[in-house]
Amino acid sequence: MSVEASRTCFLIDSLLNKKPKEELETEEEDEEEDEEEELSSSEVTSENDMETESASSSASSVGQPKPDFSAFHKIFSNLDFAKLAAVKRNGHHQPMLFRPECFFPLELSKHLHLVQQTFQMNVLQNLGHTLPLPFVPMLKNVAPAQKRLNNKRASYVDHSQKGNLKKYRCDVCDKTFSRSNTLITHKRIHTGEKPFKCEHCGRAFRQPGNLTRHRLTHTTVKPYVCGLCDKAFNRASNLHTHMRTHTNV
């Protein structure tokens, strides 16, 4: 082989050997670029995820704020509920019932309008309290029960303080009574009316209680027994009369 031919073969071999190295270098560079792109994309996605998570957490925190109970405990621990329950509203005593759910911030937003409509802050100022908006009095109508209680108390009022309560007067003898049915029974003395008649003997009475006691005379029931001689009577008054025979009174 001539010298020129050998040189030509050497150049061809060198060129053939050089091409795979260049391809390998290009392939390695491509792989490095792919890895960098994947890393950058992963970083971008992670940053996006973090942003979305932070946004969602902030949105959730805005929608549902964490309740701060310390402020509410501080507020309601200083309130005198006994005085607030007896507070005067518009000049009249009205009870105020407290809703437990209104002590919490989340439920507070639902009932805030009730505070503005049903409560007057000047009433609390008269008591020396500065009541915040979380206080929601639910006014209940207890007028019927209060009226019955007042009527019951009025029946025990001293007559000397209220004056003469015997406003029912007899038109025959001018005797006065505190109840109308007592006046009706009294008038039967003047008229002689005895509407309650015994069905056994025909005896009549002005009052039903007298007829009930009379009916015992027609039965064998004698509940009033003497403790000394075991003699029985159908009326307590007869037993009292009999007891005088033992005491010589």
From Swiss-Prot:
Annotated region described as Disordered, given as residue ranges: 20-65
GO molecular function per UniProt: DNA-binding transcription factor activity; RNA polymerase II cis-regulatory region sequence-specific DNA binding; zinc ion binding
GO biological process, one term: positive regulation of axon guidance
Keywords of this entry: Metal-binding, Neurogenesis, Nucleus, Repeat, Zinc, Zinc-finger
Gene null: resulting phenotype: RNAi-mediated knockdown results in defective formation of the distal end of the two M2 pharyngeal motor neurons.
Annotated disulfide bonds: none
Ranges annotated as C2H2-type zinc finger: 168-190, 196-218, 224-246
Acidic residues composition-biased segments: 24-52
Biological function: Required in the M3 pharyngeal motor neuron to guide the growth cone of the sister M2 motor neuron during axon development.
Protein name (record): Zinc finger protein mnm-2
Organism: Caenorhabditis elegans
